Regions:
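Conserved hydrophobic segment flanking the Walker A/P-loop of ABC-type ATPase nucleotide-binding domains
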Residues: 27-28
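Short coil-to-beta microelement around the adenine-binding A-loop and adjacent beta1/P-loop entry
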Residues: 17-18, 117
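Catalytic Walker B motif of ABC-type/P-loop ATPase nucleotide-binding domains
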Residues: 147-150
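Conserved structural motif at the start of ABC-family nucleotide-binding domains
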Residues: 5, 19-22
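Conserved beta1/A-loop at the N-terminus of ABC ATPase nucleotide-binding domains
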Residues: 5-15, 61
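Helix-to-loop junction immediately C-terminal to a conserved catalytic motif
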Residues: 51
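The feature captures the beta-strand-to-loop junction immediately N-terminal to the Walker
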Residues: 36-38
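ABC-family P-loop ATPase nucleotide-binding domains
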Residues: 2, 67, 73-131, 138, ...
Length: 150
């Protein structure tokens, strides 16, 4: 089976600090990979290079042409003026009766406590943790090949 994403001899440096040095990695469908390390050790950088947010300084990153992927990072925030429903439900392009009867959507919204926040609540009124849950829910309700969490 072909990998969803491949990193081949990838390197990345910020200033004088080399965070990635000749990293090679393949991610297959169904893989669950955890990356651990010290603060400033390159974990987020690896994920950003892996997902195309940042280009590598050297090496190659490739992925399947039809890869459906979501990235939930600590660095990106949601626009304050959007409601929770606009962030999570609208991208699905489903009518209310369709998503409300969708078990996956209901399970994600209930499991992450999103329903308790209120779907019409503006994102700008949410705490940082609530925003992260909304961002995570927006990724998990989609039909994706790969979800990357930072």
């Amino acid at each position: 089976m072909a990998n969803l994403i491949n990193l081949e001899q990838v390197s990345k440096t910020y200033g004088l600090k080399t965070l990635l040095d000749g990293v090679s990695l393949g991610v297959q469908s169904g893989d669950r990979i955890g990356i651990v390390g010290v603060n400033g050790g390159g974990k987020t950088t690896l994920l950003e290079v892996l997902t195309g947010i940042e280009p590598p300084d050297a090496g190659r990153v490739s992925h399947t042409s039809d890869l459906r992927m979501a990235v939930v990072t600590q660095r990106f925030d949601l626009p304050d003026e959007l409601t929770i429903a606009q962030v999570i439900i609208e991208p699905l392009e489903l009518e209310t009766y369709e998503w409300a009867s969708n078990a996956k959507v209901r399970d994600v919204l209930g499991g992450l406590g999103i329903v308790d926040l209120g779907l019409d609540t503006p994102v700008g009124s949410l705490s940082g943790g609530e925003r992260r849950r909304v961002n995570l829910a927006a990724a998990l309700v989609q039909d994706l090949d790969l979800v990357v969490l930072d």
